[in-house]
């Protein structure tokens, strides 16, 4: 049996070397990439085996264990209170929504009832005025309504619009009839200048039909043998259509002598306007003046307010003294803005018909108004 050789520990040590020293835990350097666990934060800053640090660590753990249940209870209490607050806010918000909705509906109903009453009142007033001011297709009755007035307009304008075809007096035929009725009232009142404005220019495109309608209604008012002479003027196309003793003729505006001779014989001059005669005319005039200035045919110093005013009067016509609108609320619909600086407006609320009572009441209002130029 082989003999076990017992080696001496000292003999195993390499020569000339110091004996190994026991390495303590705190002497081992930590890696720079090492992420310590959360618990090591309590032990940071000194030796682990120090009694003070160990006592602090144990105390901190015990304190955390005592605080966690208290925090949990507080969090649960706060959650319950927050939930109650949210529920209360939802209930209050729903109540406010229902309250304001009810208030809005109530206000809407009150306004609707008020507006309905106002509409019926205005309609009843118009019916009463229609009974009081009834011309009965007689020029003498119209003259009797006009004679008491202190003054009447020299130039009258009216804004007309096309109604739906399905309505009474709708379509192009209704528009032509309304225009001819206003012409008859104007002639009977002794007014010699009338402007008829419709936005789309339907009257300008239907001049032959309009002249026939005017002649027919004038014959109804004055009799077939005493139809007044009239002239229909279209400023945009520089044309004037005359009707003399039932004979219709067409005269170009450029023929001044013939136009002036026939103008003295007519009872009324009717100008047909559209949106083309409004702002577009002012723009075209401005472009023309700019082109003349560019070629030195017109000096900038020559462009004055009087020049612009005279040119617009020649292109569109003079400014009317009274403007009638046969609609529920005033809507100028692009009427030439240059020509209404001193014009008196008149319309009846909730009215959408061309009726004589609006015409004569407009004249009565003009007779009582005072125009202060520049004051």
Swiss-Prot record:
Going by the entry's taxonomy, the superkingdom of the source organism is recorded as Eukaryota
Q: What EC number(s) does the entry state?
A: 2.5.1.87
What start-end ranges are recorded for coiled-coil regions in this protein?
none
Give membrane topology per the record: Single-pass membrane protein
Q: Which SUPFAM superfamilies match?
A: Undecaprenyl diphosphate synthase (SSF64005)
The UniProt regions of compositional bias labelled Basic and acidic residues, in chain numbering, are 1-28
Per its Swiss-Prot or TrEMBL entry, what cofactor is needed? Mg(2+)
Query: Do the record's keywords include Magnesium?
Result: yes
Q: Which reaction does it catalyse?
A: n isopentenyl diphosphate + (2E,6E)-farnesyl diphosphate = a di-trans,poly-cis-polyprenyl diphosphate + n diphosphate
Q: Which InterPro entries match?
A: Nus1/NgBR, UPP_synth-like_sf
| Example GO molecular function | ditrans,polycis-polyprenyl diphosphate synthase [(2E,6E)-farnesyl diphosphate specific] activity
The pathway this protein participates in, as annotated, is: Protein modification; protein glycosylation
Q: Which residues cross the membrane?
A: 97-119
Keywords (alphabetical) are: Endoplasmic reticulum, Lipid droplet, Magnesium, Membrane, Nucleus, Transferase, Transmembrane, Transmembrane helix
Described by its record, this protein's role is as follows: With SRT1 or RER2, forms the dehydrodolichyl diphosphate synthase (DDS) complex, an essential component of the dolichol monophosphate (Dol-P) biosynthetic machinery. Adds multiple copies of isopentenyl pyrophosphate (IPP) to farnesyl pyrophosphate (FPP) to produce dehydrodolichyl diphosphate (Dedol-PP), a precursor of dolichol which is utilized as a sugar carrier in protein glycosylation in the endoplasmic reticulum (ER).
Which family is annotated? Answer: Belongs to the UPP synthase family.
Name of the molecule in the record: Dehydrodolichyl diphosphate synthase complex subunit NUS1
Which organism was this protein described from? Saccharomyces cerevisiae (strain ATCC 204508 / S288c)
Q: Which gene encodes it?
A: NUS1
């Amino acid at each position: 049996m082989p003999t076990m050789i017992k080696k001496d520990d000292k003999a195993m040590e390499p020569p000339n070397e110091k004996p190994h020293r026991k390495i303590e835990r705190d002497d081992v350097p930590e890696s720079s990439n090492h992420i310590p666990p959360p618990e090591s934060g309590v032990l940071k800053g000194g030796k682990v085996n120090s009694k003070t640090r160990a006592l602090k660590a144990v105390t901190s753990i015990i304190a955390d264990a005592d605080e966690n249940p208290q925090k949990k209870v507080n969090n649960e209490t706060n959650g319950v209170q927050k939930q109650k607050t949210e529920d209360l806010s939802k209930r209050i918000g729903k109540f406010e929504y229902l309250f304001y909705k009810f208030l809005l509906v109530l206000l809407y109903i009150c306004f609707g009832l008020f507006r309905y009453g106002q509409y019926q009142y205005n309609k009843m007033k118009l019916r009463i005025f229609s009974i009081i001011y009834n011309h009965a297709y007689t020029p003498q009755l119209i003259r009797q309504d006009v004679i008491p007035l202190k003054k009447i307009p020299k130039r009258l304008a009216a804004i007309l619009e096309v109604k739906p075809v399905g309505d009474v007096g709708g379509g192009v035929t209704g528009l032509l009839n309304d225009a001819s009725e206003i012409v008859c009232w104007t002639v009977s009142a002794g007014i010699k200048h009338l402007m008829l404005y419709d936005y789309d220019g339907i009257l300008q495109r239907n001049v032959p039909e309009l002249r026939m309608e005017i002649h027919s209604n004038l014959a109804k008012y004055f009799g077939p043998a005493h139809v007044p002479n009239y002239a229909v003027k279209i400023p945009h196309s520089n044309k004037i259509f005359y009707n003399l003793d039932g004979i219709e003729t067409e005269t170009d505006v450029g023929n001044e002598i013939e136009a002036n001779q026939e103008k003295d014989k007519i009872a009324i001059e009717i100008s047909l306007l559209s949106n083309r005669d409004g702002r577009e005319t002012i723009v075209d005039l401005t472009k023309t003046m700019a082109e003349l200035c560019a070629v030195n045919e017109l000096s900038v110093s020559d462009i004055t307010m009087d020049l612009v005013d005279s040119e617009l009067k020649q292109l569109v016509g003079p400014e009317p003294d009274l403007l009638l609108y046969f609609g529920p609320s005033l809507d100028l619909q692009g009427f030439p803005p240059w020509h209404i600086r001193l014009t008196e407006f008149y319309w009846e609320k909730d009215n959408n018909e061309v009726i004589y009572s609006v015409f004569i009441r407009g004249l009565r209002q003009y007779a009582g108004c005072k125009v202060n130029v520049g004051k």
